[in-house]
Structures are given as C-alpha cells and as structure tokens.
C-alpha cells in the first residue's frame, strides 16, 4: 500500500508542472481559502477515476498541481527529459544513496538517506533543480 512518502512533495510537484509534467492522475494539490483563518491552505485531493479530474478537453484545472508518485516522476524524468534517477543501497550503513545521470554522464550524487523513498525524493528534487537551471540559461 502506498503511503504519503511514496508521493512527491508540493514544491517538487510545482517544479515538475513548470517543466511540463501533465500526466493524468487522481492525486492533486490545490489551495483553498480557510474561512476561519482567512488564509489560503494547501490540500491534498484524491479523486475517483470515474469523476472528472480534467475538463472536457483533458486539461488540468490551472489552480491544481498534479501529485505524481515518486515512481511516476522518476519514469517521466527518464522518458521525457533523459534524466535517470537511481537508488543504491549501502550494505555497510544500511542507508540509501541516489545518483542523477543522463545516458552519457553522471550529474550528481547524494548519500546517507534512511529510506529508499527519502533518497528517491531527493534525487527527483535534484533532477528538477538541474532541469530548471538549464531552462533558465
């Protein structure tokens, strides 16, 4: 069963959206006005596939941010952007390391994460950061 740690966090989802991530999903982030506090709050929405998640043209509502699983984001980065995020376990420390690469070069690495999901989340964040920097050049 998937848990909260199996999905990208809000900041990563916003960055993925800016990079063009627009895959169909039943998981979203959206903001709503909390009438008690008068503040905008972030909510995580799960919808039934039978319900309308997209408008009649298949477009995500502008104020929604798609929330992919870590695997969905990892796969999209690999297939659409040519960025590979991999996880390696460290047998001596029982921790996980990530690496980010293309088919031609190793871009960056990170280590000492207590869970596979934490390492993958960080690797995806680093990938998105690198892609955004290249986009801004």
Predicted regions and their residues:
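Ampiphathic alpha-helical segments that act as solvent-exposed interaction surfaces
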Residues: 109-137
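Tryptophan-centered motif/residue detector
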Residues: 27-28, 76, 130
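Short, extreme N-terminal segment that most often corresponds to the first beta-strand
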Residues: 1-29, 137
């Amino acid at each position: 069963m998937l848990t909260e740690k199996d999905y990208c966090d809000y900041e990563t989802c916003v960055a993925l959206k800016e990079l063009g991530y627009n895959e169909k999903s039943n998981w979203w982030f959206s903001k709503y006005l909390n009438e008690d506090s008068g503040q905008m709050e972030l909510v995580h929405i799960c919808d039934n596939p039978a319900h309308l998640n997209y408008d009649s043209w298949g477009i995500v509502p502008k104020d929604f941010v798609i929330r992919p699983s870590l695997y969905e984001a990892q796969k999209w980065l690999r297939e659409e952007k040519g960025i590979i995020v991999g996880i390696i376990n460290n047998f001596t420390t029982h921790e996980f390391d990530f690496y980010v690469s293309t088919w031609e070069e190793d871009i960056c690495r990170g280590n000492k994460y207590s869970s596979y999901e934490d390492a993958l989340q960080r690797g995806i964040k680093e990938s998105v950061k690198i892609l955004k920097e290249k986009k801004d050049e």
